[in-house]
Amino acid sequence: MLTEEELKRLYRIQKTLMQMLRDRGYFIADSELTMTKQQFIRKHGDNMKREDLVTLKAKRNDNSDQLYIFFPDEAKVGVKTMKMYTNRMKSENVFRAILVVQQNLTPFARTCISEISSKFHLEVFQEAEMLVNIKEHVLVPEHQVLTTEEKKTLLERYTVKETQLPRIQVTDPIARYFGLKRGQVVKIIRPSETAGRYVTYRYVV
C-alpha cells in the first residue's frame, strides 16, 4: 500500500505527464488536467498501486499513433520488466512508451532499450524529474515538431542542409519534454516585441 507521501508524489507526477502529453499533441481531457489530489485518490482508491496508473494515449489528429505510460513497481527496473512491457506493446501495435521509474534502470535494461530502439521508442523519466513541470519554471516558447514533408520544404526554401541549422541535444530537458528524436527539426516560436513573433528552427542531434 502506498503512503500518503507517495500518493502526493504520484498525483504531481501524473499531472505533469498529462500536461506534457497535451503539449506533444496527445488527446488529454480537461478533467485529467484539472483533477485535484482528492479526485485522484478517489479515482484510484486507497489501495492504489503504481501499475494502476498505466495509461494508453493517442494523438489528437491520429488515433493509431499511440503511446503507453508505464509505472514500474520495482525501484530499479530490470530486463524482465522491460520485456514484459515490450511484449504488451508488440501485441497491441504500440511502438512508443514512457517509463516513469522510481530510481533508475539496471545497466542491462539500458542496453535492452538501445537494442530494441529501431522498433520501440522508450523514454525513461525518473519520478523526481516529473514532480514539477519544467515549463512552469523556465520560460519555454512554443515548440512544434516538423513533419518529414515540412522539414523537406524548409530545407529547400532556405537551401540549407539540416546539419547547418542550429542544434538542440536530444538529452536537453526541453527536447526530452517534447519527446524529440535525433534527426527531427523543431520550430520554436517566441513572442517578439517588434515582429509579433520570432521563429527559429533547431535540428535535434
UniProtKB/Swiss-Prot annotation:
Gene3D superfamilies: RNA polymerase, Rpb5, N-terminal domain (3.40.1340.10), RPB5-like RNA polymerase subunit (3.90.940.20). Signal peptide: none annotated. InterPro entries: Arch_Rpo5/euc_Rpb5 (IPR014381), RNA_pol_Rpb5_N (IPR005571), RNA_pol_Rpb5_N_sf (IPR036710), RNA_pol_subH/Rpb5_C (IPR000783), RNA_pol_subH/Rpb5_CS (IPR020608), RPB5-like_sf (IPR035913). It is found in: Nucleus. GO terms for molecular function: DNA binding; DNA-directed RNA polymerase activity. Its main location: nucleus. PROSITE patterns: RNA_POL_H_23KD (PS01110). Keywords: DNA-directed RNA polymerase, Nucleus, Transcription. GO terms for biological process: DNA-templated transcription. Expressed in roots, leaves and seeds, and to a lower level, in flower buds, flowers and siliques. GO terms for cellular component: RNA polymerase II, core complex; RNA polymerase IV complex. DNA-dependent RNA polymerase catalyzes the transcription of DNA into RNA using the four ribonucleoside triphosphates as substrates. Component of RNA polymerase II which synthesizes mRNA precursors and many functional non-coding RNAs. Pol II is the central component of the basal RNA polymerase II transcription machinery. It is composed of mobile elements that move relative to each other. Component of RNA polymerase IV which mediates short-interfering RNAs (siRNA) accumulation and subsequent RNA-directed DNA methylation-dependent (RdDM) transcriptional gene silencing (TGS) of target sequences. Component of the RNA polymerases II and IV complexes. Interacts with NRPD1. Belongs to the archaeal Rpo5/eukaryotic RPB5 RNA polymerase subunit family. This is DNA-directed RNA polymerases II and IV subunit 5A. It comes from Arabidopsis thaliana. The gene is NRPB5A.
